Amino acid sequence: MLHELKIYPMHFNDILKNNKNFEVRKDDRLYEVGDYLYLREYLPADEYTGKEILAKVLYVYRGELCLQDHCIMAIEVLDWWTVQSESKKIGVATDMGCF
C-alpha cells in the first residue's frame, strides 16, 4: 500500500541525507511491512516544496515505548532505479524531485 504523507523540511532533509532511517507517525493508516511512504516536503505555511522521497517500510513497532496511537517505522529510501521499476506497481509518478 502507498501512503502519501506531509513531512517538515528538517525531517525530510535528515531522511534524504541518510541521517534518519525511521518515521514516527500516528498509527491511523494500518502501516505494514512492505508498504511505501511517499514523503512530500511541506512548509508550515501550507505549501509543498516539490521535493519528494519514496521509502519502503521495513519494520513497524507498536508497543509500550510508543506514544499512544503511534508507531515507529524503520524505512529505506528507494533509489531512482528502484523507484522507476516499482512505480507502476505502487502508483507513483516517476518524476519525483529528489533523485
Residue ranges and their predicted role:
Residues M1-K20:
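Short beta-strand/loop turn elements enriched in aromatics
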Residues K20-D27:
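Short alpha-helix capping/helix-loop boundary micro-motifs
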Residues Y42-E47:
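Short, charged beta-turn/beta-strand-edge "cap" motif at the junction between a beta-strand
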Residues V60-F99:
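Glycine- and charge-enriched low-complexity intrinsically disordered segments
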